[in-house]
């Protein structure tokens, strides 16, 4: 069923079947119900409950909250990809897209971070947290995503170099592809250990000490190059609870310099980082 909201804000209730829902331009409350639904919230500060089923949700501009419930779901924190094939592709603007909250729930879900201060919770089962650009364009406010429940035994960080939507528009995806042979594989070189033991691996997890900044972490390792990823215990940044520290993911853009793009709240201690492996990092 095709359901369209008004541009004045609306309550939208989906059917038990497979729905296509377009929320409009104002603040919406959307309950999609059962079925495999496609939901485009549009502008405004929206509350979206996708319900059971394999759902695809685009939050749109504004600070939105998405509850996906059960099923294998695909959640976008902003309007990064079209609901209809005729929609124009997004170009990253010179401003944030809103600070969104995504709860994926049970199922093997894909959560796609935007360029706001997003909060992502994957829920049960193996989830993929997708990042498409490592630092905002000039003129934006630098924000990074918080991942609340990364499970090192089954979850993965996916770093997008070719555009998750498939059209390889590099304006929307600027990670460097370090996969084993073809996009979608695990990272090709990986290191987990003391900072002085790292020598140019494409993903480096530092487990012997923490750092107060991404630049300090980059300075502590040797032979880092643009596009490498550093994971370190953050001594400075507090998690969403305002009390505990966590792990930070940073993108190297030059020697001794890196940008933080994600914070993992539940990896509280350096000892938690020792369980990270190459299988926790993939490239598109």
From Swiss-Prot:
The UniProt record gives the binding positions of Ca(2+) as 100, 109, 118, 127
Q: Name one GO cellular component term.
A: extracellular region
Q: Which GO terms describe its molecular function?
A: calcium ion binding
Compartments reported by the entry = Secreted
Please list the residue ranges covered by the Hemolysin-type calcium-binding repeats. Answer: 13-30, 31-48, 58-75, 94-111, 112-129
Pfam families per the record?
HemolysinCabind (PF00353)
* Keyword terms: Calcium, Metal-binding, Nodulation, Plasmid, Repeat, Secreted
Q: Which InterPro entries match?
A: Hemolysin-typ_Ca-bd_CS, Hemolysn_Ca-bd, RTX_toxin/Mannuronan_C5-epim, Serralysin-like_metalloprot_C
Q: Where is this region: Disordered?
A: 1-27
Question: Which residues are the signal sequence here?
Answer: none
**What does the function comment of this entry state?**
The NodO protein may play a role in nodule development by direct interaction with the root hair cells or some other plant surface in a calcium-dependent manner.
Q: What is this protein called?
A: Nodulation protein O
**Originating gene:** nodO
């Amino acid at each position: 069923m095709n359901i369209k909201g008004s541009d004045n804000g609306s309550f939208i209730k989906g059917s038990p079947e497979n729905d296509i829902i377009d929320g409009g331009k104002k603040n919406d409350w959307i309950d999609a119900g059962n079925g495999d639904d496609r939901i485009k919230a549009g502008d405004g500060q929206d509350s979206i409950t996708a319900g059971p089923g394999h759902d695809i949700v685009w939050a749109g501009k504004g600070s939105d909250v998405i509850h996906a419930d059960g099923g294998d779901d695909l959640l976008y924190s902003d309007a990064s990809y079209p609901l209809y094939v005729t929609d124009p592709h997004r170009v990253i603007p010179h401003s944030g897209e809103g600070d969104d909250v995504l709860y994926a729930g049970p199922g093997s879900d894909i959560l796609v971070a935007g360029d706001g201060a997003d909060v992502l919770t994957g829920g049960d089962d193996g989830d993929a947290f997708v990042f498409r650009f490592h630092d905002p364009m000039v003129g934006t406010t630098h924000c990074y995503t918080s991942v609340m429940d990364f499970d090192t035994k089954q979850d993965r960080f996916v770093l997008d170099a070719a555009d998750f939507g498939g059209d390889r528009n590099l304006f929307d995806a600027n990670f460097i592809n370090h996969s084993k042979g073809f996009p979608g594989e695990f990272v090709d070189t990986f290191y987990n250990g003391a900072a002085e033991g790292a020598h140019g691996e494409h993903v480096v997890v530092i487990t012997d000490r923490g750092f107060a900044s991404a630049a300090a972490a980059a300075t502590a390792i040797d032979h880092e190059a643009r596009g490498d990823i550093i994971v370190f215990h953050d001594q400075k940044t507090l998690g969403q609870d305002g009390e505990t520290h966590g792990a930070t993911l940073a993108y190297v853009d030059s020697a001794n310099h890196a940008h933080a793009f994600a914070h993992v709240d539940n990896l509280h201690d350096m000892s938690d980082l020792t369980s990270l492996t190459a299988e926790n990092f993939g490239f598109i």
